[in-house]
Amino acid sequence: MNITTILFDLDGTLLPMDQEAFTTGYFKSLAKKLAPYGYEPKSLVDAIWAGTAAMVKNDGSCTNEQAFWKKFAAIYGEEKCQSDQGLFEDFYANEFNAARDICGFNPASVETVHKLKECGYRVALATNPIFPHMATENRIRWAGLTPEDFEIYTTYETSTFCKPNPAYYLEVARSLGAAPEECLM
């Protein structure tokens, strides 16, 4: 079987970054945004990590979004989570974009994605689906690309597994209607 589909990672691949510096800057910005609403910074970061762990352990019975918020609600309470969800959405639409300054830029990323598409390959973004679509779309733009450059891109709303679970890659292939052996990561 021939390779028909190219899957790219985002963080550290299409979007150059020091993962530790990015995570530190991202959490600092999120904590600053949410502190006035009763979120103590260290507790918030711990809760985000707990929600992330819940997504990584997701068995496919729910979306990663549902796994995250279930864990987050267990820490902060269902009512607070529901009332404050808009604060998180506003953060990803606005303050999150300051993290772009922490990331690098590689024009070869844009050139490579476009060239592969010109050559007839299907191109998908198989980034670890631990972020909402808005954050993923922003990071795609930071790399000089657009969401439309990809046939699909994974987010916590649309995925039920995370890396490194092999089921994540099968889920991506199924979403594309491609056989796993047709895909190159």
Regions found by a protein language model. Name each.
Residues 14, 83-85, 110-115:
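Short glycine/proline-centered loop/turn elements that form peptide/ligand docking sites
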Residues 45-94:
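A metal-dependent, Asp-based hydrolase signature
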Residues 124-184:
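Substrate-recognition "cap/lid" segment bordering the active-site pocket of phosphatases
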Residues 18-21, 59-60, 100, 164:
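Short, solvent-exposed loop/turn segments at secondary-structure boundaries
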Residues 13-19, 53-57, 122-124:
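A ubiquitous short alpha-helical element
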Residues 23-31, 48-53, 69, 88-96, ...:
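Hydrophobic alpha-helical core bundles mediating ligand binding, dimerization, or RNAP-core interactions
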Residues 1-50:
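Active-site neighborhood of HAD-like aspartate-dependent phosphohydrolases
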Residues 90-93, 97-105, 109-143:
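Substrate-recognition element of Asp-dependent hydrolases with the DxDx(T/V) motif
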